[in-house]
């Protein structure tokens, strides 16, 4: 991509936007003008309002200070929690729709405004999504893909639930607005409660061209620059390609341009084998409490491999990073074919026996095991950001400090797995 640097600058301390939050851009064919609606955030009340900037070329932007949309307090919405405007054109209704994350009586809602001219907005009496769980839903994003409509959003989470990017889908926009939520349960038509990644990917927004649609979000830094540290409210941009399955559900895969960028081949150098490991020409077969360590990674790495589990068998295996012989703690990504999960854990591993002490997951996400027992794995790393793709279906983003320029390994903790065709590349 090409960076055009800062597009819309923050305002002064006495204006509505000394800090700027996310929004969306829409093109008005009639006026040949781009409209970006964004969140203005400040310390004094009302803390958040919706603001506007316009452009003729989508590069040079001018703030329209005549536009200011505040929370509809007359309808009971909180004046301080009103953000993340998403605007799209509804060709059927011949109007623009704006979705905004809002709060009412302590519960989160995605509310809706409509307009025919992008300047005057009317509040719809019913929310776009009536959030029965009360969670605060941020960054709403609605789009049509093929014959389905989708809403992608970021659930801020609660004390007992993580913050994640999720989605709903339906065959029409009206059905999407009235998505059936029964007995407090997530719609059964959406597997794994609509999780699109793990808890280290947030604030996902989408955009597409004539061929593909992509999902961008950020992978947070962690306090103390420790893999186990508390997530910070900042991070690195991560992009996924959205894959629409035949039944309308969504999967994630690597964008082709990112995959192609890692074009410089790197020689795979084995350093150590521990435990029950059988080596053939292009594969390793590992059993419980075994691992194979390889030489230090670069700053930017692509790792591809195929993992096969014997028929009528179940296994737990994965990749280990910061896998140093003089350091007991390893950052392991567990592919739990046996338990239907992907997990990141920092665990202690015995260098002589391969035995390890279990620990709680730093991040995790549910998956459906491969029906044919075969896992095609692609890993992309840049400095401390690590994204794992499984079978072109699941994405698992994490922050792993000290990953770069340190050894890595493949391992098995339960059952048996054969890992073949391991390839490394960089850019």
Identify what each model region corresponds to.
Residues 1-418, 423-427:
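Carbohydrate-active catalytic/glycan-binding domains of CAZyme proteins
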